[in-house]
Amino acid sequence: MIIVGAGVGGLTAAALLVKAGCRVLVLDRNPHPGGTAYVYKRKGFTFPMGPLGFGTPSVVIKNLQSLDGEDLKLSPIQYRIKAFDLDIPISHPFPKMIEELIKLFPTEDETIKNFFRNMEEIVSAMNDPDMDPNHSILGKAMSESAMEYLSGLVKDWRLRRVLGSIGTQEPYSSLPLLSAMWNLISNQGIWYPVGGMRSLCDRMVQAVSGHRANRDKFGEIKLGTEVEEVRIERGRVLGVILRNGAKIDSAAVISNADYKNTFLKLIDSKFVSDEWYRAVMRARQTSSNLQLCLGVDANGVDLSSFKEADRIIYRRNQADLSGQIDWSAEEIHPEALVCQELEVSLLSKNDRKLGPEGTEIIVIRTEAEHFHFSRFRPTWRKRIPEYQAYKMRLGRALIQEVENLIPGLGRAILVMDIATPLTFEEQGGRSGGAVAGWSWNYEDGSDYRPRELVRTPIQGFYMAGYQAFSALFMGGIPTAMESGRRAARAVLQGDGPVENIMIPVTE
């Protein structure tokens, strides 16, 4: 059994197949396991590659317990929105959220109550969507976008943005997806694993390769080993070809790469229909991020903004909300970048072991478009000289802006690392640097529940990872784990290929 990619989905599938008695080989071009859930080090500091926590903890705990029988200790993550001259806690169950928002928007009290009542109704309906009453509720919810719904409900533009994006943006998603996200962040909560994201990945690695004494249960992970091509003949998978030309046979292959990397790079287009190929090529994904990781001297910064928060969704109070960044320009003005929504995380508050004693780790993220940065890359993993200076200008602007939240930040920096969409693409294996899978925009999808995308048109070839479902209703890590579980089950059951195109594609 071959699994391409040692991300969370691939490791979950591998561990379950090993547990079932299969011999499994996991191949990954990176020098580390875990995909973007892993971490990297800079001068004694440990920085994140991707997720800073996860929702739907029951799925993560259940899957890990099925792998090794051990429990998982978690600590809650508290979110706040600081924008529009408002300070809003959002990591509270719906009743408390109603109470907090009515304090800030007293004239919108009935609107706020109706909104969360509707969110609760949609969440409940999604738990059993095939029941007749629930089917009707969800069908109605999909008939208009979150923007259309809230524009007719909310008078205050600030409240519309908070309710519609759980942040500072205008509403953009469907109502079912919005309700799922509110349910995650408020009712279920976002959680950080005690021991950090690396310990989570290492535990999954142990579940794959920790059975070497038992010859019947053998899993092997080969890092730094890149798959060049998936071998296919007459509609059936045969194995893979490595970048060094070596061929490895296997009657089943699971790809933990995303859909575009898999079907546009690893598989010759002649092995799938034109319709399938076009669907994958045209399917829209989320945008990427510009990420700034900082190791700072704790004595040099004022962290009082984080007294009741671990993560802050921030936007400058007087930011111009009328215009958008022109990402088609050769360079964007740093001032335009800092007027966007920023996510500022005090990561060391959740994990004191990430940096040396007396230090803190701060992560700043904001949305960025991959195509804007592509001109800085002449070839894969190469950059033109202007790239470093440009991303440093953007990073310095973000630091200056975040000093409104964290006074003294600029002078207290000990280590700084900046990742662009090119980094997320090359180091994270995410096509286009996309950080959250398929597009979340209402016009790009019509699901009120995630469609499983594990099976493919090729016999014996399956998908795992955050794109193996049509939407991240559970959040990234739980979705990846669940996809790995279902991919392993599909292999063991010998599930056949699919004919219908289930990928979310805008016509």
Briefly describe each language-model feature range:
Residues 1-118, 439:
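N-terminal glycine-rich phosphate/pyrophosphate-binding loop and immediately adjacent elements
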Residues 226, 232, 492-507:
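Active-site-proximal substrate-binding core of FAD-dependent oxidoreductases
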Residues 51, 468-491:
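A conserved FAD-binding loop/helix module that cradles the flavin
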